[in-house]
Regions:
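Histidine-acidic metal/acid-base catalytic patches
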Residues: 1-4, 11-28, 51, 58-60, ...
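Active-site-proximal loop/turn and secondary-structure-junction residues that shape catalytic pockets
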Residues: 9-11, 34-36, 71-73, 111-115, ...
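A generic structural signal for short
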Residues: 6-7, 41-42, 79-80, 120-121, ...
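Conserved beta-alpha-beta core of the PfkB/ribokinase-like small-molecule kinase fold
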Residues: 145-146, 173
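Structural motif corresponding to the early beta-alpha repeats
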Residues: 28, 32-127, 142, 233, ...
């Protein structure tokens, strides 16, 4: 496994600066973030900018395992839905343009909806992801579902249902376990259940159970990374363990992405040592 950091923590910072920050702290991978208000907008980024980003990645030695690019395909307004779908597909096209030696990164996106809508909306959600998976198959890109507390796909069984319902190798899982943790789930159960679908992960810390929960910087809560990392490795995962900093943290008045990135690095590398897990460098 490799230790990564998500540009979600600093998505409006120039992309070269994102890469420089993550590389300078010792991480081995970076997740880029593409959206309408981010420094990297998949719908407007030029070929020159893409080449510059790829060059910066190559110079740094950082792996690019993922691009986060969210779009709500449950929107009822046809124009809004069309824009959301176009943004995610543009993210998939960007993944192809930024592909490195190991191929294009996956594209992470959420299912949206509300928990109480799962039964009524699950087929539409599956159809939405099947649509994206077909586009991914054409482009050679994997779409990775991000489960999310407060959304329809908030529990391991629901996540497994939609993954199996779509049944495409181009539709896999971005394993963000924090959302399961604040739902009161036990990683000794959900890791064996879902790891076989995982192509990428997010890691953060958390406190409390939904609805009274808070996402935190790794190390601020009580989550046992030294116990978790060997479990997910034993389950067969060998990709990036990518730190994601929640908007809850970013909204703090003293928020500093470089400081939380450095602190997260120390927390995860220490936990890996205590758990007997080695983060391998990029080949």
């Amino acid at each position: 496994m490799r230790l990564g950091f998500s540009a979600w923590a600093m998505s409006t910072m120039p992309v070269r600066d994102q890469i420089s920050l993550v590389h300078g702290l010792g991480y081995q991978a970076i997740e880029l973030v593409g959206g309408d208000t981010d420094a990297l907008n998949p719908m407007t980024v030029t070929d020159t900018e893409v080449r510059d980003i790829r060059r910066a990645l190559d110079d740094s030695g950082l792996e690019l395992p993922s691009i986060a690019c969210h779009g709500n395909l449950l929107e009822t307004d046809p124009a809004v839905r069309a824009h959301a779908c176009a943004r995610v597909i543009a993210g998939m096209e960007l993944a192809v343009r930024l592909a490195g030696p190991s191929g294009p990164p996956c594209v992470v996106t959420m299912g949206f909806g509300l928990p109480e809508q799962f039964d009524t909306h699950r087929q539409q959600i599956a159809d939405n992801f099947a649509e994206l998976a077909r586009a991914g198959a054409h482009l050679g890109v994997i779409v990775a579902l991000e489960p999310h507390v407060g959304q329809a796909l908030d529990l391991p069984d629901r996540v497994q249902w939609v993954l199996d319902a779509v049944g495409s190798p181009n539709f896999r899982l971005n394993f963000d376990n924090s959302h399961f943790e604040v739902m009161g789930c036990d990683f000794h159960a959900y890791v064996p259940q879902l790891t076989r679908y995982a192509v990428h992960t997010h890691m953060k810390d958390q406190r409390g159970i939904a609805p009274g929960f808070e996402f935190l910087v790794p190390g601020e809560g009580t989550f046992d990374y030294a116990a978790y990392l060997p479990v997910i490795e034993k389950a067969g995962y060998n990709g990036a363990i990518t730190v994601e900093i929640s908007k809850m943290v970013q909204n703090r008045p003293d928020y500093d992405p470089a400081e939380v990135a450095a602190r997260s690095y120390r927390t995860l590398t220490d936990a890996a040592k205590r758990g007997g897990v080695t983060f391998a460098p990029v080949a």
